[in-house]
Amino acid sequence: MDQKVKIARAALHMWEEPCISGTRGSGAVFFTGCNLRCCFCQNREIAIGDSGLEITEERLAEIFLELQEKDAANINLVTGTHYIPQIIAALDCAKKHGLNIPVVYNCGGYENTETLKLLDGYVDIYLPDYKYAESELAVKFSHANDYPERAMEAVNEMVRQTGMPQFDAEGYMKRGTIVRHLILPGHTRNSKKVLKLLYKTFGKQIYISIMNQYTPVFEQKEYTELNRCVTRREYEKVLDYAFELGIETVSYTHLRAHETEL
């Protein structure tokens, strides 16, 4: 085993969805790099920076086992798209040495379905984003004009692999797909379109996680609407729409104390 990967962090992570982190924490491995270049990236240093440590596939397998020993609820592979062959090799090695907790594939949604098929049988839970239903925003903020179509194809493949969501007695997800959507300030119309599209296409086959924690990480000179957090009114407007649609399999974050009332 001599192929290397670069990871920025590996630790118990307590801030994923409740059915992923719970009280035990998710065994998150943050890979350096990302296949998207979102101008509002909330993990910019990891996604487009050069931070991190190069390790072998064998060491990656050891990290998976160490996280399991720390009672991680799962192994959470964060933005690992560009390292899939190495991840598969590390999972094979770790499973031979006793890895038996669910594997989560945590990504931005902009995936190739043929690549995802390589993960069939390795990944138990998919945790993709679905950022845009509007191509104009995909081009504007992520330079990915085909994001809506490509991400939808990816989620279709993920659902094909995982089937209906399954949970254990403690409420942790064992298998399934959770699609995340981060509300962007000033763009509730896009969020509503995302929810309608996901619910119409997948119904109860997926969980939808509606996130309001967008934070400006630096001043946007070109896209000034992104220089603020999502307001309480914007967030509640999107949540209300989700409930109007009849979405029951939805997860959402609590409103933050510093949010404005606008």
Question: Whereabouts are the PLM-identified features?
Answer:
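Short helix-capping segments at alpha-helix termini
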Residues: 94-100, 201-204, 245-246
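Short glycine-enriched, charge-decorated loop/helix-capping segments at active-site entrances
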Residues: 45-51, 140-145, 222-229
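Conserved Radical SAM active-site core
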Residues: 1-121, 125, 134-135
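Single conserved hydrophobic/aromatic residue that forms the stacking wall/gate
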Residues: 254-262
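Active-site beta-loop-alpha junctions enriched in small/polar residues
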Residues: 80-82, 108-110, 182-184, 211-215, ...
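Non-cysteine beta-strand/loop elements that form the S-adenosyl-L-methionine
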Residues: 122-134, 207-213
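Generic structural signal for well-ordered alpha-helices
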Residues: 64, 88-91, 116, 155, ...
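Conserved strand-turn element in the central/C-terminal portion of the radical SAM core barrel
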Residues: 142-144, 155-190, 194, 212-213, ...
